[in-house]
């Protein structure tokens, strides 16, 4: 029995050794690991500069039209200038001007007569400051009493005006000469009425145009003028010297020296209307034959005043005016001179 028990114990031990060892008890199933995607690229080392965050992309450029350069404002127009009546303008201009004076007077017996003196001037600028000019004249006289009536084409004038503004001041110089071809020469067999018309024309024009009526003389004319023009106001003065040299006939003075001067004041009541007045003075600087004949002929003083309209026609100006003038001393007061001037300048 003992032997049988030993034999069975040995067999059991041998079977236990041949059987595989039992594994440990199974553990709870672990959660699945996250799936990763392997990138099969080689990553270069990252530098410090690359480690900075990338700059935001620049916004797309918007197409904007470049504005045109600013246009300069137009220059303000020059202040309005009151055009004088018989003084010379202190501007170089393109102008055609018809200027007529009707004078009424009496002779020593109190009989009335009249004179119409007409001037026509043309001027054209060759530079902004220089304007050559030509001036023509005609006079018609209805003499009082038994004196003969007459007409005369008087000496033309050829010359030039040089004018420049200096702030509100305008300066001008004038140089001209007469062409001694006028009618009424005392050395020719002309109608005596033309001689009388020339003498009457001098007084009708306040003695300011002596050179044109001195038909026997070649005259050199030189003058200067200055005007203050601002705020609708004009104040102008001028002075002129005339040197006359006889070139026709053998009688009379071989030479004479005359002078004229004047002052003009004007004001614009509205842009289309101005009022102007001027004082005019003429004096013989030499003892010319008229002075020797009667000392009161040495000088004349007149005063004129009147309105002038100003009409802009496109780029042109029409400035018609009318003035009344009266003599302030002899011989004009002796003959009771009253003068009306109609002035029609057209600037283009």
Predicted ranges, named:
Residues 17-99, 104, 109, 161, ...:
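Outer-membrane beta-barrel biogenesis signature
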Residues 89-100, 128-134, 158, 171-175, ...:
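Transmembrane beta-strands of outer-membrane beta-barrel proteins
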Residues 90-119, 138-149:
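Surface-exposed strand-loop-strand hairpins of Gram-negative outer-membrane beta-barrel proteins
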Residues 97, 101, 108, 245-348:
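Outer membrane beta-barrel transmembrane domains
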Residues 103-107, 131, 135, 139-143, ...:
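Structural signature of outer-membrane beta-barrel domains
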Residues 112-118, 150-156, 169, 214-220, ...:
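Residues that define the transmembrane beta-barrel architecture of outer-membrane proteins
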Residues 125-131, 139, 165-169, 229-233, ...:
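Outer-membrane beta-barrel channels and translocator barrels
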Residues 147-256, 312:
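Outer-membrane pore/translocation modules
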């Amino acid at each position: 029995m003992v032997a049988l028990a030993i034999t069975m114990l040995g067999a059991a031990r041998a079977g236990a050794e041949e059987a595989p060892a039992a594994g440990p008890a199974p553990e709870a199933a672990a959660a699945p690991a996250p799936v990763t995607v392997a990138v099969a690229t080689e990553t270069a080392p990252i530098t410090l500069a690359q480690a900075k965050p990338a700059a935001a992309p620049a916004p797309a450029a918007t197409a904007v039209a470049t504005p045109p350069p600013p246009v300069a404002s137009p220059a303000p127009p020059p202040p309005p200038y009151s055009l004088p009546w018989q003084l010379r303008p202190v501007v170089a201009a393109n102008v055609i001007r018809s200027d007529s004076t009707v004078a009424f007077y009496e002779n020593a017996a109190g009989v009335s007569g009249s004179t119409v003196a007409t001037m026509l001037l043309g001027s054209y600028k060759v530079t902004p400051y220089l304007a050559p000019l030509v001036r023509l004249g005609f006079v018609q006289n209805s003499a009082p009493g038994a004196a003969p009536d007459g007409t005369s084409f008087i000496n033309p004038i050829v010359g030039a005006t040089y004018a420049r503004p200096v702030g509100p001041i305008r300066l001008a110089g004038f140089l001209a000469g007469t062409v001694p071809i006028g009618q009424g020469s005392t050395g020719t067999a002309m109608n005596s009425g033309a001689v009388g018309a020339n003498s009457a024309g001098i007084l009708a024009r306040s003695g300011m145009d002596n050179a044109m009526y001195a038909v026997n003389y070649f005259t050199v004319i030189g003058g200067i003028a200055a005007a203050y023009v601002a705020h609708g106001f004009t104040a102008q003065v001028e002075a002129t010297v005339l040197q006359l040299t006889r070139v026709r006939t053998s009688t009379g003075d071989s030479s004479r020296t005359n002078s004229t001067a004047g002052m003009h004041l004007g004001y614009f009541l509205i842009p289309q209307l101005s009022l102007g007045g001027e004082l005019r003075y003429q004096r013989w600087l030499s003892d010319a034959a008229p002075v020797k004949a009667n000392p009161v002929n040495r000088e004349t003083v007149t005063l004129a005043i009147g309105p002038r309209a100003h009409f802009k026609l496109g780029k042109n100006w029409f400035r018609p005016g009318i003035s009344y003038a009266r003599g302030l001393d002899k011989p004009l007061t002796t003959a009771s001179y009253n003068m009306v001037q109609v002035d029609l300048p057209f600037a283009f």
